[in-house]
């Protein structure tokens, strides 16, 4: 795949959302190659199409105090957090048209337009995103994997048992290190993507029930010493992405 990887640095969520729309249209028209946007966001909670308001635990006063924006967006899944120290990736790539069951997962969605054909193996696409992140983490020295029936990338309990931030009871459970929530638009271009926890302020997960699951969340900073630089993590992700999607 001829991939254009673009590093946007720290960028507002709404601005990045608009860029996805602009670039996806260009890709669909053949004016831009498949693109991977890599970035960080200011503090924000985003709710997908399956989002439930009760999974937001902080009130408006607390949100203002912590400087957190809230957006309801057109990806699949429930609520997640984005913020500085977390690597967000938005792959914008065309998928091969393929009729598929819309109900296969809550964490990815197709454009809701029954007048147009359902396109693409989006479940297979999400599995490839998981494979990409697992491979990138392996390059960084962290073993990770999937969990049956769930979307995202997880660290086994015996790996993060030394995590000083994690509650003792949570060290006995798998912990989520990367979240995935995507959309495939009516022209077959992917939107949204993944969020990999590198060294974010983990206190912000206290404000939500992430992805509607009461499971522990972990970051590379909990697992590696020293913490790899963000540029190193980005390169690992780009290399893994190019290999998996070759």
Listing of model-derived features with the role each one plays in the protein:
Residues 142-147, 191-192, 203-208, 246:
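Short conserved catalytic/interaction loops centered on acidic-Pro-aromatic/His motifs
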Residues 89-91, 151, 180-182, 194-198, ...:
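A structural signal for short, well-ordered beta-strand segments
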Residues 57-59, 177-198:
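Short, conserved beta-strand/beta-arch hydrophobic-aromatic motifs that form part
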Residues 1-174:
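N-terminal lobe of the biotin/lipoate ligase/transferase fold
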């Amino acid at each position: 795949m001829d991939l254009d990887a673009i590093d946007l640095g720290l960028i507002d969520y709404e601005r990045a959302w608009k860029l996805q729309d602009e670039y996806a249209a260009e890709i669909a028209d053949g004016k831009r190659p498949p693109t991977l946007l890599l970035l960080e966001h200011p503090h924000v909670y985003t709710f997908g199409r399956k989002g439930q308001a009760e999974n937001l635990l902080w009130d408006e006063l607390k949100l203002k105090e912590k400087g957190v924006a809230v957006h309801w967006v057109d990806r699949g899944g429930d609520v997640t957090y984005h913020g500085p120290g977390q690597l967000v990736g938005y792959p914008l790539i065309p998928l091969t048209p393929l009729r598929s069951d819309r109900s296969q997962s809550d964490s990815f969605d197709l454009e809701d337009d029954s007048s147009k054909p359902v396109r693409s193996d989006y479940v297979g696409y999400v599995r490839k995103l998981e494979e990409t992140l697992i491979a990138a983490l392996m390059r960084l020295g962290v073993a990770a994997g999937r969990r049956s029936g769930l979307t995202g990338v997880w660290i086994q309990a015996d790996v993060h048992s030394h995590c000083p931030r994690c509650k003792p009871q949570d060290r006995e459970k798998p912990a989520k290190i990367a979240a995935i929530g995507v959309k495939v638009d009516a022209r077959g271009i992917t939107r949204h993507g993944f969020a990999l926890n590198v060294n974010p302020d983990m206190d912000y997960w206290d404000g939500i029930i992430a992805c509607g699951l009461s499971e522990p969340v972990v970051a590379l900073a909990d697992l590696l010493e020293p913490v790899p630089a963000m540029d190193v993590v980005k390169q690992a992700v780009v290399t893994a992405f190019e290999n998996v999607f070759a």
